[in-house]
C-alpha cells in the first residue's frame, strides 16, 4: 500500500490533504507523509531528518535502538513472540528504530562497500528508511537464510495475524524498490495486514 500513485486531484482540500487519482488520501504532517492514515517512508516519501516516532514505548531520548519502537507494535510483537515460543520457535528483534543520523552512516558504509546502485537495492537512503518511523524491525539473523528457517516460515505464514506484513515480499522488487527481505516486518495493524497477506 505504500507506493501508490501520487497524482493529486485538482480540488485539493485546504486542510493539507490531497486525494490521488486512485482515491487515496495523502496528508503531510510535520514533514511526514501519511497515506490513508498510515505513516509512509519509502523511496518516494522521505521523513525529515528531525522525525522521531510518535508513539514510542520508551522516549527516543532515553532509549536504545529496539526499545523506541511503537507501543502498539511492541504489544503485538510480544504476543507474536509468545505464540512462536509456544511452538518451540525463537524470534527476536535484531534491529528496530534507527535515527536519521544512524541511517546516514549505515547507508554511506554500504555505498562505500558495494556502490550506490547496489546499496539502493537493499538499504534505504537517509530519510527513506522505515526504521526511522519506529513501526518496523528486522528479525533474528537479518540474512537471506532466515526465510528457510522454521522461524522464517512461521513468520511468513502468521505475522499478519498480529498486524505485521513482510514489507519487502518476494517477487515485488519492482514495486517496493528493494530486494526480498523475509526478516523485515512493518506494523500496520491486523486489518490492513490481513488484506496485504
Each language-model region and where it sits:
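Extracytoplasmic cell-surface/polysaccharide-interacting catalytic and binding patches
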Residues: 1-96, 100-197
